């Protein structure tokens, strides 16, 4: 079933179009239940080989392809050698595109981790004041770090006992209370897509040929994500006789994805991390990924066990895929009353 997706038809051949692993957007019990968009048949198409795209809706779509086309049809016609000049021709193209996060939510960096009720008790250093303490303070002040809420003290450079990346616990000395305003943005990078394509065409009075090969390399805006795709295509047409013409097209695509980030509301989702990342957390503190002495066993989650370490998600909880696909079609046109 296609769900609510349109049916994709390439040179008359319907392609499978549902997402590979729809999973659960909310309430997933573990990483395996999260949604992962590995793409569909349309993502296997090489844009360099597309001649035209036509969209069919309603009765015209279902009349041709039945119930599968209830959500419409995207009809793709690939290139051939029909429009080429006589003789042989070779063309080469290359292009690169860059990607960045276009817009960010207006995150608040005025207050840090904690709750409004965290007021220092009489006899402590923070008596009657909002305070922060990563773990119990040296004077017995209770910990305020066991929450993902950011209703704690205002950032005014106060001296609090905070997390120390050196000992992966409470620092031995108080440090200034400051916000790290790029502690989400710095997880992302500039992505790019590089494409190189070569095509060979040939045409005579009785037929035409087009063959192409394209390599695409993508590095996405999150580290350790992206894909490589190699596409090859051959299109040929030959006038066998005055009455008979044969057309043949075949395409092969190899697509390898090194990591597709999971989607949804779960601790193994980058989106989940972005929601609950606190403004007083330096992103660099999470880069070691593992607790010292427990490498590859226990991930470093200094602020909450409910929030996955983003670097573990990206480098260890990978969702790779490798796919080979082929679409071929052959047709013959016979003129009955040919003279």
Question: Residue spans of the language-model regions?
Answer:
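Repeated loop/turn-to-beta-strand initiation elements of outer-membrane beta-barrel proteins
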Residues: 206-209, 243-246, 339
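Membrane-spanning beta-strands of outer-membrane beta-barrel proteins
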Residues: 34-39, 69, 193, 227-229, ...
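Short acidic/polar hinge/loop motifs at secondary-structure boundaries
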Residues: 13-57
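Surface-exposed loop/interface segments of Gram-negative outer-membrane beta-barrel transport/assembly proteins
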Residues: 21, 83-179, 190, 220-225, ...
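Outer-membrane beta-barrel transmembrane strands
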Residues: 189-205, 214-216, 310-339
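N-terminal periplasmic accessory domains that precede
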Residues: 9-11, 63, 69-94, 198
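Transmembrane beta-barrel domains of outer membrane proteins
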Residues: 77-79, 199-203, 212, 233-237, ...
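Short beta-strands and strand-coil junctions in structured, solvent-facing domains, enriched
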Residues: 1-2, 15-17, 59-64, 81-84, ...
């Amino acid at each position: 079933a296609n769900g609510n997706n349109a049916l994709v038809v390439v040179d008359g051949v319907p392609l499978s179009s549902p997402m590979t692993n729809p999973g659960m957007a909310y309430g997933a019990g573990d990483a395996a239940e999260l949604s992962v968009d590995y793409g569909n048949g349309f993502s296997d198409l090489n844009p360099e080989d597309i001649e035209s795209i036509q969209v069919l809706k309603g009765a015209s779509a279902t009349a041709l392809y039945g119930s599968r086309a209830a959500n419409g049809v995207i009809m793709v016609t690939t290139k051939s050698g029909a429009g080429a000049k006589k003789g042989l021709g070779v063309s080469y193209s290359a292009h690169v595109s860059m990607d960045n996060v276009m817009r960010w939510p207006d995150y608040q960096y005025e207050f840090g981790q904690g709750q409004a009720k965290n007021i220092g008790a009489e006899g402590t250093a923070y008596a009657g004041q909002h305070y922060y303490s990563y773990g119990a303070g040296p004077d017995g002040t209770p910990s305020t770090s066991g929450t993902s809420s950011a209703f704690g003290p205002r950032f005014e450079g106060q001296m609090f006992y905070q997390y120390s990346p050196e000992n992966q616990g409470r620092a031995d000395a108080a440090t200034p209370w400051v916000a790290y305003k790029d502690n989400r943005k710095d997880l992302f990078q500039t992505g790019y897509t590089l494409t190189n394509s070569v095509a060979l065409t040939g045409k005579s009075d009785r037929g035409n040929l087009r063959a192409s090969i394209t390599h695409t390399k993508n590095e996405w805006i999150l580290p350790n994500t992206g894909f490589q795709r190699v596409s090859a295509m051959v299109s040929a047409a030959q006038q066998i006789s005055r009455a008979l013409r044969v057309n043949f097209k075949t395409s092969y695509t190899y697509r390898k994805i090194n990591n597709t980030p999971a989607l949804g509301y779960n601790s193994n989702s980058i989106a989940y991390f972005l929601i609950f990342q606190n403004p007083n957390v330096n992103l660099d503190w999470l880069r070691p990924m593992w607790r010292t002495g427990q490498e590859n066993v226990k991930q470093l989650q200094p602020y909450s066990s409910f929030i996955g370490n983003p670097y573990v998600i990206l480098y260890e909880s990978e969702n790779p895929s490798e796919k080979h696909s082929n679409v071929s079609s052959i047709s013959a046109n016979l003129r009955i009353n040919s003279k």
